[in-house]
Amino acid sequence: MIGVAVAALVAVVVVVQSQGSAGVATAEKPVPTTTSVASSTVSTTATTSLPAQVRLATAVYDLRAGRYVSRSDEDTPFAAESLTKLLIATDLAASGRLAGNNLARVKGMLSTSDDQIANQLWTADGGPAIVTREVRAMGLRATVPPRDPGRWGDTTMTAADVVRIYQYVMTKMPAGQREVLLSDLAATAHAADGTDQDFGITQAVPDGEWWAKQAWACCRPAWDVHTTGLVGADQRYVVVALSQQPLAGGFAGATKVVTGVAKTLVAGLDLTRP
């Protein structure tokens, strides 16, 4: 198990958010301010040390060795937000329709985290039934469809299940489909709505190789900011950090915390090819 301590003074930007139909936030009106939210350090203690208002779950899994490197609160559920897009994409692939126009749509949905494309595919393919199908296909243990069928971002998911999703992609998907999805996990610097999604894994492995899916939303009732993906030249490790953080820290503060956590999670990993 790993422990996480959050303690430092950083300058952040409070961002007023609007909610889309799927539960993923769109940034508006940045307002400069300062608050005590922190860059994070992660230690190898047996307990998690976090302020009460911050929830965090992490997991690092070595696909080559078939074991966890570290994990903390990996069975705690969080709102998946844009991580649901991974299920939309894998469900589309399983149906044999990851071709033609759908290739471009999935690329936009994953790399630029385009909510409008996700809305369209979610509605067209049965909404919550997508989650149900992928839970069965991947053997997910704690992923639950949203209560409101129109809000795909309200799907709940654990860090352990995120690991299982990436395991499925890397070990069970046909090679052609896997390569398509990996090429789409590019996490462009800015999302389709203009949000800066260069945080977490993409900051933690700036000179290495990563394939990442980020997620964020506000304000129901707090900031949900997640970073997930594969790191290492041969996609050896799955790295997951899920968080729920106070509104006062703003988006910049929340991403700074997640980036600090991600940097420590990958610090001891061998990211070179065998």
Please identify what each model-predicted range represents:
Residues 72-78, 95-96, 104-108, 116-124, ...:
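Second-shell loop/turn segments in exported
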Residues 88-92, 121, 162-169:
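Buried hydrophobic packing segments
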Residues 86-87, 115-116, 129:
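A generic alpha-helix surface/boundary motif
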Residues 2-7, 15, 21-31, 40-65, ...:
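Penicillin-recognizing serine hydrolase domain
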Residues 66, 76-100, 109, 239:
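Active-site SXXK
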Residues 35-36:
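N-terminal, intrinsically disordered, polar/charged segments of Gram-positive cell-envelope systems
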Residues 111-115, 162:
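Acidic/polar active-site rim loop that often engages polyanionic ligands
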